[in-house]
Amino acid sequence: MKNIVIIITVAVSFNLFGESLQMVSSEKYPLYRDDSKYDCLINGYNPYCQDICKLHNTKEGYCKNYFCICEKLSKENVKFLSEIIDTCNERLDKIL
């Protein structure tokens, strides 16, 4: 009985430890205005994702599980490109 309790405790600990490691990850998905991710077709190095990440104020990006990922993307820049588009649209509305 003690062995089962120990095994369950160890399994739960590894599960919680794994989840906490994911939260520390320095890679994040850049997002559109509607909170959707940028799709990509080729996993690994991807010029399209590199460009998207540069537009979101970070230098490195790649494709992972068919979505663009940016390394060291701050929370402020997750939707950075959308904010620029919104600002431009507002200015155009004022002009027109």
From Swiss-Prot:
It holds the Pfam family Toxin_3. Disulfide bonds join 40-63, 49-68, 53-70. Expressed by the venom gland. Its main location: secreted. It is found in: Secreted. InterPro entries: LCN-type_CS_alpha_beta_dom (IPR044062), Scorpion_toxin-like_sf (IPR036574), Scorpion_toxinL/defensin (IPR002061). One of its GO terms (cellular component) is extracellular region. The keyword Disulfide bond applies. One of its GO terms (molecular function) is sodium channel inhibitor activity. Residues 27-89 form the LCN-type CS-alpha/beta domain. Keywords: Disulfide bond, Neurotoxin, Secreted, Signal, Toxin. PROSITE patterns: LCN_CSAB (PS51863). Residues 1-26 form the signal peptide. Belongs to the long (3 C-C) scorpion toxin superfamily. Has the structural arrangement of an alpha-helix connected to antiparallel beta-sheets by disulfide bonds (CS-alpha/beta). This is Neurotoxin 67.1. It comes from Lychas mucronatus (Chinese swimming scorpion). The lineage of its organism: Eukaryota, Metazoa, Ecdysozoa, Arthropoda, Chelicerata.
